[in-house]
């Protein structure tokens, strides 16, 4: 499993699943000694932090998910300010139904940032829902009166419609995560689960507030996790990024060797077949690189059509052999246009390799490797050249 997929699958449980699990442990064991006032403060602090992070990183989906949770929590709290009779019963049912619906819709939506059109349309949609809930709260529906106690919210989850709604939403959110494997999709699932537990615990009070705090933390942390993925992984090739490569070089133990691979005539593929074919070629070469390195080696996209790998403990000759084996496999591959099966020509790579010298700077090592790559290009391409020891 490549580095991107490992990190992506880890995000199914980290941080959302772990945060919710820790909350459950603290509540069930009685170790949560925070006062209700402090929990309320943490809830609003987490909400504010989530809003700021979502705005700063242009994550409108998470921003509006936090807004949905805030509106739902406020609605549940408001209904307990007076007699909880039939109309409030209907409004609570609507609130509990609308939260999973909105989470699914936000998960299915494309991330469009905070453009005026997307913000206004989403706010209007949420305003209409809020109006419906308010209208239900004022309507004279003939529902059985409910006692003024938080414990009477939990039975709403026993409704077959509520169970079906949460079940369908949970399945859809999990499917979205499996398809996309991104932190936001995982956060929607775990945050919705925490919301269900908040409602099940009564909707208001110390336990419910703890679950609402967890909801906000899960969504806020998903933005940080997404930022990490964008900084340290290349989404196109699923390889680690240049930053991850450089950070590894700063911490790796000697001896080690590196290889730089450059796709021959890459511009020709882009100019002849279009950028989509160029991206396909890049993904194919990245796949051969990832499959061809040894256990413990690191492959990364360094920039453009240039890929690099670090081979810890490898001599210059071992590095050359590994790189040349990858080069030969790429040259022997048959690359075709997706959908039509049209062959797009032979793809070849040129490779330069170098071994770290004691006392050598990172920049000097990369420069020697680039010089070896240049020699490979000058030698007719589709070959591997080792830098002078």
Task: Describe each model-derived feature in a short phrase.
Residues 1-228:
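Regulatory sensory/coupling modules that transmit signals to nucleotide-handling catalytic cores
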Residues 229-247, 261-275, 283:
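Conserved nucleotide-binding and Mg2+-coordinating catalytic segments in signaling enzymes
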Residues 237, 259-262, 304, 369:
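Conserved metal-coordinating catalytic motifs of nucleotidyl cyclase and c-di-GMP turnover enzymes
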Residues 242-258, 269, 286-294, 312:
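Short regulatory alpha-helical coupling segments
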Residues 286, 318-339, 349, 368-370:
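Alpha-helical scaffold within the catalytic cores of cyclic-nucleotide enzymes
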Residues 298-301:
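A short pre-motif secondary-structure segment
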Residues 310-321, 338-342, 349-365:
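Catalytic strand-loop-helix junctions within cyclic-nucleotide turnover domains
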Residues 320, 354-388:
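Catalytic-core segments of nucleotide cyclases and related cyclic-nucleotide turnover enzymes
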